[in-house]
Amino acid sequence: MIDFKLAELRKKHNLTQQELGEVLNVSYQTISKWENGTTSPDLSMLPHISAFFGVTVDALLGLAPLEDTYRPSGSGTAEYWEYRLEYLLHTRKTMWNRDYMQFLVRDVWNIREPITVLDCGCGYGALGLLMMPLLPKGSKYVGIDFSRNMIEAAKKYYRYSDINAEFIFSDIQSYRPKETYHLVICQAVLRHVNDGENLLRKMADFVKEGGLLVSMECNREFEADGLYISGMNYMDLCRHQGLRKLWQKELEQQNRDYSIAMKIPHYMKAAGLKNISSRMNDRVTVLEPEASDYEDFLDSIIKANHWDDEKTDREIETNISYFMNHGMDRKEAEDYCRQMNGIVKYLKNNRENISLTHTYGIMISYGWK
């Protein structure tokens, strides 16, 4: 698909259609027709037009980004998370089996005495709500997050619980704790930040001698293969070559690592931790229409993945521009947008009869100080 960028370039250079027509020796009506797609310029004119604007022909045709300047992902910023409470609520609903967390606490980490827990990047405190009732009585939970809205939400969720909890509004990177903790933990944090290894080392500093550091992270490759929808082609759902380029671009440009889950055990060793190991979260969501909680879980899966509505042409072009800026070529970006819209359409048309399997592929890595 060609996305002719003439109008965008003309407006960026503060030119009227009349002025651009005079430069190119055509009428303003011709410029208007080119911009609205009624007609197209002769191929021989493309080098002249692109040279005038100082861009490549591929960029003029929308086959390459107009700007070389990389636009960083904002997922490691407080602003990004201020209004994503609903997203966290929906994703956490299908993230854990309670009995597996109980197995980790009692049989793997062998926690038998009351402990203090620091949850780094706690969000609304989902991990504490799951874990704290499984810990010995007298344990304390401390959650820290750089989103004020998330901290306020956490306080509301814990207000009427029996959990001894405290919440701190602060950036982990600049946090200076008054004490160290028996257990320092994070969930789905390191994949979102720049330089996750550095943040992990920072977390290790918060751990008491003899204490435990735990990181729970999705490996994005696992996650990209972790969805099957009956009636859709599984191989098509797994196709993500363009995403691999995006992951590589973000790693090169801002040191955001979508594969960090695989590397964390080795980062823990470099940070001086001992008896390091890793496990896989055993949660796999299998959804069938007959399930009593079918609508609830389907709704959460749809909203967690932003599959509520098909994207408009304008939204698709905005997304394509972003994806191309992050390493995809235009075809890969178009294919990915088409894939997402295809999922939305299928789920909407078959809402009453969806069968699916979904897993995040979360790796749980841990080591003692």
Could you describe each region identified by the protein language model?
Residues 44-59:
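DNA major-groove recognition helix of helix-turn-helix/homeodomain DNA-binding modules
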Residues 258, 262, 277-368:
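Conserved Class I S-adenosyl-L-methionine
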Residues 66-115, 126-130, 134, 150:
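Conserved class I S-adenosyl-L-methionine
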Residues 118-120, 124-174:
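Class I SAM-dependent methyltransferase SAM/SAH-binding core
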Residues 198-212:
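A short glycine-rich, Lys/Arg-flanked "PGG" loop and its adjoining helix->strand segment in the class I
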Residues 1-12:
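A short, Lys/Arg-rich alpha-helix, primarily the initiator
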Residues 219-307:
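Conserved catalytic/acceptor-binding region of the Class I
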Residues 176-184:
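A short acidic, Gly/Pro-enriched loop at the edge of an enzyme's catalytic core
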